[in-house]
Amino acid sequence: MVRREGDAASGNAGAPVLPQTTMAKTTVRLRRWFDPRMGADKSLICRWIFLRALALIYFSAFYSLLFQIKGLIGPQGIEPAAHFMQAVAQYYGATRYWHAPSLFWIASSSPALTAVMWVGIAASILAFLNLWPRLSLFVCWICFLSFVSAAGDFSSYQSDGMLLEAGFISLFFAPGGPWPGLGSDDPPSRISLWLLRWEWFRIYFESGLVKELSGDRQWRDLTAMDQYYQNSPLPTWIGYYVQHLPHWFQAASVVATLVMELVLVFMLFFPRRVRLICFFIVTPWEIGVILTGNYAFLNYIVLALGFLLVDDVYLTRFVPARWRHPAILPEDRDLAAREPTAGSALHMAGVILSGFLLLWIGYATTAELVDMAGSPILPLKPAELLEPFRIANQYGLFAVMTRGRYEIEFQGSNDGQNWQPYMFTHKPQLLNEAPGIYAPYQPRFDWNLWFASLGDWQHNDMVPITEEKLLLNDRDVIGLFRSDPFNGTAPRYVRAVLWQYWFTSLDEKRHTGNWWRRRLLGLYAPAIERLPDGQFEIAAPPDELPEHD
């Protein structure tokens, strides 16, 4: 028997020893997935574009909150962050910081809230300019997580989870350094690229899955899109015209949606040319969704993630030859040139830590997908541990389609007879006002009222709270509206009424100029009177409203 060199020294003469070449190959394979030094160097341009898009999405999120945050969660807002954090502290005790990770534990005053938003805006601008991108994106993520963790019902949107998940993974995807350019010396690790693509896949596939699992007949009888454009949270004027296209078009849209979400997205797992075809199918679709419905920054995240289906081999043809950097040329690069040196222990420790975190996210999201599909065979505890950070999410858009458009309108009065409406900034209200295109701006107050209109006031306490705030002439809450009908004074009575809205026909619009018609359904919540001593009293009970969803 031939003794291998080194057996005696190891004291394991009889133990099998793997050939060195096999061990080396295994090490290289692992490092190709987790070590940026051996990363996906054919995705440098794509990464650069994606990170600029992510920075713009962060900017839109912080910018829209800057004008709303005091009225939403300020000390005098509808759901004060301080009250929410206090409730979290009482429930979770010593683990409250884990269950609600937020800078607002330090302070949640109005100046503190707006300061965090300004810091987020500044960091998003730095990230867009590619200055300290990894650090800038980390600051963006911390600031946005701080809001989401403290905002209660005002941060329960899937788009918030999408941004936090993509933002966290991007901390490992982005290049380091103050001004890295394309980051050819610090390419993205393959695991981070794969997880961003995996998020893109799950947004589509899980949305298709919930449509099938919900049992909503509208998806099965191909009528789900018949009133979709009218009933969406914030319609657009383009959606108005698409709504009036023939039923065959709406039915075809249903089929296309299901095919894309349940079938075409699997093209992600095919070779690069197939992924390119997928990219050129889904991108126009997402642009169409943006034009026909205001879903804040949701579709912009999906667009940005979808761009990672492309690679530099394809994009290089659009780059002038004199601008091409060797790092983005199609030829393979010498990976040995990026072998770690003996002094790179700190680097390898970072690779191991980042690999652990990213594998944790990968497992958690896979377990949630398997559970959603009805096969709870994987433990969900790892996913539950990450839940407070919103970095391993389940998605499922439009599982059940709404069957009508309902709008809550706040009205004030000084005599209880003549009522003046508080005008919203973005929600449909005036019949002759065209619905606009506002995304990626997100008016969270308007959005939450759309959801509230589908239920009753007992389960949507933001409605009676808003009534009281208007009676108190709270300027932060009044700032959530377009205008104050009482010019800075408080009315004596406030009520919330419920309307049902429909798009007008094309012929009616030509004759009247109205985009909408509506019917009053009744009093949504109790009308409230403020007495001379400052106490509140119910002036009228809510009406018994017809069923609506």
How would you label these PLM feature ranges?
Residues 3-4:
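Basic polycationic patches enriched in arginine
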Residues 8, 13-18:
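Short, low-complexity intrinsically disordered segments enriched in A/P/G/S/L with frequent Arg
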Residues 21-549:
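Alpha-helical membrane-anchoring segments
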